[in-house]
Amino acid sequence: EKLSGSDLNYNDKGSTTIDHYKINNYAKEVNGNIDLRKALVKSSNTYFADQVQKIGVDSMIDVSKRFMFGQEIPFELKTAISPIPYNDKTTALELGTAAFGQGKDLVTPLQVALYTSAIANGGNMMKPHIVSEILDPSGKIIEKVTPEVLSKVADKKIMDTMKDYLKSSGDRNFAGFVKGKKVAGKTGTAEKTKDKIHSWVTVFYPVDNPTIVCTAFFEEENKIAAEMIPLVKKLVNKAIELGY
């Protein structure tokens, strides 16, 4: 929200230094001159670590609150609160690492699914439910959950731009997921320790009129997220088979 036009451009040299600490891209990949779209597609750590410095801590706290970080999510099952990883004592390095999902970031799969759904829904984060409707033995609907907006996270124009960017990421990572349809989304890999890796995959389908969000978290699987894509593909296609 704070950056636009040429502010979104960045020369990715494969690494950057913040507070005397070197941050590398995965495999130290050098992406050259990129914008936000390509940074998402290429998962450029350096782009987000440096660009977030222009945005600042206060703006990141504001955005985090709109995405329901630091707040209890109303849900039928107990779920942990995803804390806001920023405060007035946050250093430039902490801000930079949090911007690409490392550092003090702690987030639940439900939170990431809601985050993804907000982008898919043009900025509306919907209140989650386990059951959408209850049927009697004859199949008649006796109770149905009314959709409810939990948070308006950003203007539709901004979210539609993000949706388009995630489509570009999907074209690279999720091509062929569903026959004849496009899937948008993002992969993510976080290093817990040198030998323990967390992997994420989150997608929405179909791109033009989303009805499905699928988020998968693989704890300490020691595999990059791309290796987990086939499982998520099975989940999405099963949901389609069931009529969602």
Pin down the residues of each PLM region.
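Beta-lactam-recognizing serine transpeptidase/beta-lactamase-like catalytic domain environment
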Residues: 1-218
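Short amphipathic alpha-helical face segments that pack within enzyme cores
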Residues: 108-114, 227-234
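Short, gly/Ser/Thr-rich active-site loops of penicillin-recognizing serine hydrolases
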Residues: 141-143, 229-244
